[in-house]
Curated annotation (Swiss-Prot):
<dbReference type="GO" id="GO:0030548">
    <property type="term" value="F:acetylcholine receptor regulator activity"/>
</dbReference>
<feature type="signal peptide">
    <location>
        <begin position="1"/>
        <end position="22"/>
    </location>
</feature>
<dbReference type="InterPro" id="IPR016054">
    <property type="entry name" value="LY6_UPA_recep-like"/>
</dbReference>
<keyword id="KW-0964">Secreted</keyword>
<feature type="disulfide bond">
    <location>
        <begin position="28"/>
        <end position="34"/>
    </location>
</feature>
<dbReference type="GO" id="GO:0045202">
    <property type="term" value="C:synapse"/>
</dbReference>
<protein>
    <recommendedName>
        <fullName>Secreted Ly-6/uPAR domain-containing protein 2</fullName>
    </recommendedName>
</protein>
<feature type="domain" description="UPAR/Ly6">
    <location>
        <begin position="25"/>
        <end position="95"/>
    </location>
</feature>
<comment type="function">
    <text>Binds and may modulate the functional properties of nicotinic and muscarinic acetylcholine receptors. May regulate keratinocytes proliferation, differentiation and apoptosis. In vitro moderately inhibits ACh-evoked currents of alpha-3:beta-2-containing nAChRs and strongly these of alpha-4:beta-2-containing nAChRs, modulates alpha-7-containing nAChRs, and inhibits nicotine-induced signaling probably implicating alpha-3:beta-4-containing nAChRs. Proposed to act on alpha-3:beta-2 and alpha-7 nAChRs in an orthosteric, and on mAChRs, such as CHRM1 and CHRM3, in an allosteric manner.</text>
</comment>
<comment type="subunit">
    <text>Interacts with CHRNA3, CHRNA4, CHRNA5, CHRNA7, CHRNB2 and CHRNB4. Interacts with CHRM1 and CHRM3 probably in an allosteric manner.</text>
</comment>
<dbReference type="GO" id="GO:0005615">
    <property type="term" value="C:extracellular space"/>
</dbReference>
<keyword id="KW-1015">Disulfide bond</keyword>
<dbReference type="InterPro" id="IPR045860">
    <property type="entry name" value="Snake_toxin-like_sf"/>
</dbReference>
<feature type="disulfide bond">
    <location>
        <begin position="89"/>
        <end position="94"/>
    </location>
</feature>
<dbReference type="GO" id="GO:0099601">
    <property type="term" value="P:regulation of neurotransmitter receptor activity"/>
</dbReference>
<feature type="disulfide bond">
    <location>
        <begin position="72"/>
        <end position="88"/>
    </location>
</feature>
<dbReference type="Pfam" id="PF00021">
    <property type="entry name" value="UPAR_LY6"/>
</dbReference>
Length: 97
């Protein structure tokens, strides 16, 4: 009985430690895409990718911004305008191209 209790306690502690670790996301900005993985702050829960069409850009490549965020933001809260798409995910380095 004590062995089962000990195993249960070990499993709970390992889950708590995993939850306390920070997520990793690509954090960068570039036309057409970018990648630069780095650790987020502990309270970040999502990796976010935004793509903004810049009308003056002659190559018609979107300006891609990748970041860590608390939750998945809605487009108006980012203040990026009408030509924006957004994608969110919740696993480390999931916001790759």
């Amino acid at each position: 009985m004590q062995l089962g209790t000990g195993l249960l306690l070990a499993a709970v502690l390992s889950l708590q430690l995993a939850a306390a670790e920070a997520i990793w996301c690509h954090q960068c900005t570039g036309f057409g895409g970018c990648s630069h993985g780095s650790r987020c702050l502990r309270d970040s829960t999502h990796c976010v990718t935004t793509a903004t069409r810049v009308l003056s850009n002659t190559e018609d490549l979107p300006l891609v911004t990748k970041m860590c965020h608390i939750g998945c933001p809605d487009i108006p809260s980012l203040g990026l305008g009408p030509y924006v798409s957004i994608a969110c995910c919740q696993t480390s380095l999931c916001n790759h191209d």
